[in-house]
Amino acid sequence: MPMAAILGVEGLALTDWERGFLREADPWGFILFARNVDSPDQLRRLTAELRHAVGRDAPVLIDQEGGRVQRLRPPHWRSYIPALDQMEQASHPVRAQWVRNRLIAGELHDVGIDVNCAPLADLLEAGTHPVLRNRLYGPDIPTVVAAGRACAEALLAGGVLPVLKHIPGYGQAVVDSHLALPRVDAPREVLASRDFAPFRALRDLPIGMTAHIVFDAVDPDRPCTTSPEAIRLIREDIGFDGLLMTDDIGMEALSGTMAQRAAASIAAGVDLVLHCKGDRPGMEQVASATPAMTEAATGRAIRALALRRPPEPADIPALVEELADLVPEAA
């Protein structure tokens, strides 16, 4: 069984140390960032190199939401406005969401990336932190669900697996979880009827990502990522039975060493630990504390990867033109 982890790497190509480490550690998958991106040809070489290092067709992930969170940028790739701006400006927001993500999927599949960390089902609230705000689809549950579904279906049509995030919801976070631990004191019934509702509606998606956030009504002592009660809630109350990965355990919302964070996440019940930085000390700590995937996690991974299919035919120039017609302010 592969190690229950998704790892980042340092640069545009693997170092000799990384090749040897990855061969031995055998993480389930990899994640790429702007530091790993230069050109389409370079990315194709890197994604092939990552898979060769572990000797299998390992998934390669990225955050390509469009807008601020976009690792592939011009001049080689298209630019997109923030998701919230598009939802507010488009003549047909849900169709625009599908077209946008079908174009993104085409760009990702072309360079060997087969998992995109989207859609976001967090609800926009009055106090939502600016780091998240314009990445969201809106404050209305049916709209967010429809936009999330359109995103996921478009990615799948383009040969890319979607990741539902951030379960069970960052919308009420008023601090940036990259820098501190958000805490929400809303009653359980409010959370169930609002924050958790979009995730329940999208619970059939193949992969999900946890939120580093404390809900006092769920577990006042631990963020969801390392809380057995929160993971139980995700599995049983929300009903998500897909492959469950953490958000980046390097974020400041979590405490302890990388080894302690990885171990606590696995102990809580997540399937996979995400470590993004690509630094040798962090990677070695994660590898020292992260076991092989469980039988249950392996089953979920097999079900998710079975949805990786060749892209459906698409007229890309026509889709580019359609998106410009749907969102004229962004053209």
List each language-model region with its residue ranges.
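Short glycine/serine-rich loop/turn segments
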Residues: V115-P139, H166-D185
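N-terminal beta-rich core of secreted/periplasmic extracellular enzymes
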Residues: M1-T128, Y137, V144, E153-A154, ...
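Second-shell residues forming the walls of enzyme active-site clefts
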Residues: R35-A53, A146-L156, V160-A297
